[in-house]
């Protein structure tokens, strides 16, 4: 019995110690290294291209755009129309580098009242922009009762152009 175990161990050790057969090489997976396709693949590995899908997704835009939002007299609540929402959404995406919000009035009230109206209008636009997903760190607010008149006309149609909030969108 002992000899049978010894012989079985010797046979199994001899079988394990033989080297494996070398693989056969057929050559069917060979790729010529100097072919134009191989050179192009190597060039793309070394210098990958930027994805072009985003370039076609968002058309080129000017570095600075301004949108004017007009308000009725002494109204500070921002209730955008669907046209205003569409225009602003088009300009806000992708999120611009910075947005300046300037509240302005028509100088109809004494300066302290006009300053408050301009400030609250600018804050209304600021809050709307934040609710639309624009980071607060990218928005600057300013307001002034007497500044940057669009119209110096003393009559109501000219004054309407002065009751506004300018939204200046900076891309660069």
Curated annotation (Swiss-Prot):
Entry annotated with the keyword Signal: yes
One GO cellular component, as annotated: cell outer membrane
Span of the signal peptide: 1-15
Topology of this chain in the membrane: Lipid-anchor
Principal cellular location given in the protein's record: membrane
Protein's job: The virB operon is essential for intracellular survival and is not involved in the invasion process. Constitutes a major determinant of virulence in mice. This protein is essential for pathogenesis in mice but is not required for intracellular survival.
Name of the protein in its database record: Type IV secretion system putative outer membrane lipoprotein BAB2_0057
Species, as recorded: Brucella abortus (strain 2308)
Lineage: Bacteria, Pseudomonadati, Pseudomonadota, Alphaproteobacteria, Hyphomicrobiales
